[in-house]
């Protein structure tokens, strides 16, 4: 008798695919929808050439808006796969990943749709960039220089004027590590 041990990864489904398929679900599902907040984050990354790479989408552990971007990128990429190749391909990718000898999402994607995950990512990236360039063309021709009142934090939200109009109260994750950790800030307009 010979005893042998082989290191086999227990989880091969990357976060973008797990979260993206959970949010997409299936055709005509109406539980979780693409919304303006998700779109704003992804649009900003796309037009500023700062999209998460295919490899970066495969992990959490980022600070600020980075983890949120893994969710948003995964949801959008799963929608892209469903719209471009058919929603059945998402299921096929997951089935491919369930094989005991399949350790690569890149290969599982190639087996399902005929191109590697990296090639798919480049198609997705081009589609995003082209789409957002078209949508922002008129905006870009009328850009104004804003007066930035605070440049800390990745989430500065829910601004509210004081009754006398001299202060702005808002919540921000400035001085915190995560998107969900916010404090109340008061900005004095004076």
Residue ranges and their predicted role:
Residues 165-169:
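Hydrophobic beta-strand positions that form the internal "hydrophobic ladder"
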Residues 1-91, 95-143, 147:
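Acidic/His/Gly-enriched intrinsically disordered linker/tail segments
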Residues 145-150, 190:
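A short beta-strand motif characteristic of beta-propeller blades
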Residues 35, 84, 151-156, 171-184:
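A flexible loop/linker signature enriched in serine peptidases of the S9 family
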């Amino acid at each position: 008798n010979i005893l042998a041990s082989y290191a086999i990864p227990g989880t091969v489904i990357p976060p973008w695919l797990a979260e993206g398929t959970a949010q997409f679900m299936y055709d005509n599902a109406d539980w979780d929808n693409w919304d303006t907040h998700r779109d704003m984050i992804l649009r900003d990354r796309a037009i500023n050439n700062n999209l998460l790479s295919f490899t970066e989408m495969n992990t959490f552990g980022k600070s600020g808006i980075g983890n949120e971007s893994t969710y948003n990128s995964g949801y959008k990429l799963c929608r892209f796969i469903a719209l471009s190749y058919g929603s059945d391909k998402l299921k096929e990718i997951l089935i491919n990943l369930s094989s005991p000898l399949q350790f690569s999402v890149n290969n599982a994607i190639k087996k399902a749709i005929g191109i590697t995950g990296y090639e798919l990512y480049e198609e997705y990236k081009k589609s995003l960039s082209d789409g957002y360039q078209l949508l922002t063309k008129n905006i870009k021709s009328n850009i104004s220089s804003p007066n930035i009142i605070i440049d800390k934090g990745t989430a500065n939200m829910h601004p509210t004027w004081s009754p006398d109009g001299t202060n702005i109260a808002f919540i921000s994750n400035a001085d915190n590590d995560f998107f969900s950790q916010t404090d109340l800030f008061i900005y004095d307009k004076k």
